[in-house]
Amino acid sequence: MFDIGVNLTSSQFESDRDAVISRARREGVTGMLLTGTGIEESRHALRLAEGAPGYCWSTAGIHPHEASTWTDAAALSIRQLAVHPQVVAIGECGLDFNRNFSTPSEQERAFSAQLAIAADLGMPVFMHCREAHSRFMMLLRPWLEKLPAAVLHCFTGTRDELDECLQAGLSIGITGWVCDERRGLALRALLEYIPDDRLLLETDAPYLLPRDLHPKPTSRRNEPCFLPHIVRQVAAWRKQDAVALGRVVDDNARRIFRLGQKGE
């Protein structure tokens, strides 16, 4: 089972990153994608990935919250980072109109520019969308034929939004949000509509700790070692074997991000 969304650059992991990776390995996590959310974070994610070759890979991009930092220099930095074999996707990029830490126009500019970079480099794109579906799809659609793959991570949308994403060819990342008995029930009901070959699973650690873990961890920090719990729960709700589903999502991640095919 492969975790496609780990924010290992977070300061919450500052004191024990090696132990976090070791715990994930011990629990059967077969690899992880480290998320770049800004230029410095993308550089940091790459350094961490290079420290665990064959197990960790990274993305390079600017998150919509940080879109106000977009410049021509940022675009050049992303292109330079993307040359490295461990960098396998452009992102995390997209739109987030929920909190608007950057203005919608700043977000749209940065998102469109990163889609152009991904298309130009022939790389998958790792995306974020919150309360911005219509505009997100409007900006994304013109690029889809030029992208080898497009992943929408941490999907929390509606059935209609899911259908539109699937029809457009997107792969869908599901987090421990689905384990939340308060907020996750609507998402849980959508699991059966995601085809096996479009499903990806992720922790989004250190965020989104599954609420139904037993026993409950003493810390609120999420970790990749909890991915097996998400796999088991999703498998049960999809009426699938958990071991088989773990293999499916691992195969999907390796195919979509072309792991081992970039000069490694």
Curated annotation (Swiss-Prot):
SUPFAM superfamilies assigned to the protein according to its UniProt record, in alphabetical order: Metallo-dependent hydrolases
CDD domains on file: TatD_DNAse
Subcellular location: Cytoplasm
Keywords: Cytoplasm, Exonuclease, Hydrolase, Magnesium, Metal-binding, Nuclease
GO MF entry, a single one: single-stranded DNA 3'-5' DNA exonuclease activity
UniProt xrefs under InterPro entries: DNase_TatD-rel_CS, Exonuc_TatD, Metal_Hydrolase, TatD-like, TatD-type_Hydrolase
Cofactor(s) listed: Mg(2+)
Pfam families found in the cross-reference section: TatD_DNase
Gene3D superfamilies: Metal-dependent hydrolases (3.20.20.140)
Residues engaged in binding a divalent metal cation: E92, H128, H153
Documented EC number(s): 3.1.11.-, 3.1.13.-
Main location: cytoplasm
GO cellular component, one term: cytoplasm
Family: Belongs to the metallo-dependent hydrolases superfamily. TatD-type hydrolase family. TatD subfamily.
Functional summary from the UniProt entry: 3'-5' exonuclease that prefers single-stranded DNA and RNA. May play a role in the H(2)O(2)-induced DNA damage repair.
Subunit structure as annotated in this protein's UniProt entry: Monomer.
Protein name listed in UniProt: 3'-5' ssDNA/RNA exonuclease TatD
